[in-house]
Amino acid sequence: LFVGSSDVYKRQEFDMATGGAYKVTYPSCTGSMQLLLMHNGEGSFYYATEDRNACGKELRAVCGSKSVTFVTEVVTSEGWTDATTGRFDLPWTTVVGYNPDGWQAAALQWYRPFTFTCEWGNKSLQSRNIPQWLLDKDLWIRSKGVTDTVMAAINKTIDFFGEGIGVHTYYWHNYPYDTHYPDYFPAKPEFEGMISTIQKRKCHAVPYINGRLWDPAADSYTALNGASASCRKADGTLYTEIYPTSKVLNTVTCPASSLWHKIIIGLVDKIQNELHTNGVYICLLYTSPSPRDS
């Protein structure tokens, strides 16, 4: 069994005996391509999902005595159901094929052309809308807090390494860390000045926001009915997590929710327009392999 991975090929090839099973999570470091290929000396069987949205899924292969079962397991998304009609559609097709010339030929003939139809594969790196300063960045530092001590440390770092550093800023909002998300505003009073100082020294500042948590204690959770966009367990109750950094109960928001899209887009626009940052880092927008239903 050969698994689509960014790792060295020989590390992702497995002997599959009767009763053997293999599973891989896509997308991940060990599953960077949404395909499985089973081959022997006679040829290769090809199994792939053609999902141009790169939705999270688990690909599995289970060997019986005379057969192999290939399975795609996925937690469904709110975005796959039409809000008007209520119709559910799986947003991809699954394709299979057999190539007598082996797994390399199968991948070149079927998977490679598919990647060129995807957002991540249909443009070269040079043609993508990526600012040059980001491409040129070879050193990032992370700052924690908005204090004179933190700013002094940033200035000292710039003095040593020179201009062009990226400063990844945390703890810039008024509420304690990992609480009241996504209600980041107002920012700490000194933060805009901190951004300006970094930029005057010809460096770039990119603050952190969390892309998945919605604190039920946040004003916006009640005002906007956050529970309607929160992920749920199989029994219908809210899926929640407690981070050791805050020890408060947070709900996890479905990344496909139109409500969450509006919140994140609006937040990013507000951070850049009002605080004049060079960008925004959205952490954990889609993460965690544990099963969740939205």
Which ranges hold each PLM region?
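Active-site-adjacent "subsite" loops/lids of carbohydrate-active enzymes
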Residues: P207, G211-K270
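Active-site neighborhood of glycoside hydrolase catalytic domains
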Residues: A256-S288, R292-S294
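Alpha-helix termination/capping residues and helix-transition junctions
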Residues: F2, D159-G162, I265, N273-E274
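Short, functional N-terminal and low-complexity linear motifs
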Residues: E119-S124, F161-G164, C231-G236, T277-I282
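Short, solvent-exposed coil/turn linker segments
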Residues: D7-D15, N250, C254-P255
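Conserved structural scaffold segments of CAZyme catalytic domains across common CAZy folds
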Residues: F14-Y221
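Conserved small/polar residues in nucleotide/adenosyl-binding loops
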Residues: V3-G4, V8-Q12, Y286-D293
